[in-house]
Amino acid sequence: MALTNADRAAIIAKFARAENDTGSPEVQVALLTAQINDLQGHFKEHKHDHHSRRGLIRMVNQRRKLLDYLNGKDHGRYVSLIGELGLRR
């Protein structure tokens, strides 16, 4: 199931760098991670849903690109973000 508005607001509030920050790489990666984790549960039940799997792969690739960007811009922020989200890289 998709993220609710309350879930999105909580993630944005936790990872925002400023008050109305919704576009920083940290926020975008955190939102993508929540959606990816949600879809992983969906695929445990619906193994043959290849259409949604394509969307999942697209999200994973987008998250990887954002993490690569953040790593190049500010390695300290990158390390703290992957530590907070529990990502292995």
Swiss-Prot record:
UniProt entry tagged with the keyword Ribosomal protein: yes
Claim: RNA-binding is one of the keywords in the record: yes
PROSITE patterns: RIBOSOMAL_S15
Source species, domain of life: Bacteria
Pfam families, sorted: Ribosomal_S15
SMART domains for this protein: Ribosomal_S15 (SM01387)
Listed SUPFAM superfamilies: S15/NS1 RNA-binding domain
Annotated GO MF terms: rRNA binding; structural constituent of ribosome
Signal sequence coordinates: none
GO biological process, one term: translation
Coiled-coil ranges (or none): none
Gene Ontology cellular component terms for the protein in this record: cytosolic small ribosomal subunit
Record's keyword terms, sorted: Ribonucleoprotein, Ribosomal protein, RNA-binding, rRNA-binding
Description of how the protein assembles with itself and partners: Part of the 30S ribosomal subunit. Forms a bridge to the 50S subunit in the 70S ribosome, contacting the 23S rRNA.
Function: One of the primary rRNA binding proteins, it binds directly to 16S rRNA where it helps nucleate assembly of the platform of the 30S subunit by binding and bridging several RNA helices of the 16S rRNA.
Family statement: Belongs to the universal ribosomal protein uS15 family.
Entry protein name: Small ribosomal subunit protein uS15
Species whose genome carries this gene: Acinetobacter baylyi (strain ATCC 33305 / BD413 / ADP1)
Taxonomy of the source species: Bacteria, Pseudomonadati, Pseudomonadota, Gammaproteobacteria, Moraxellales
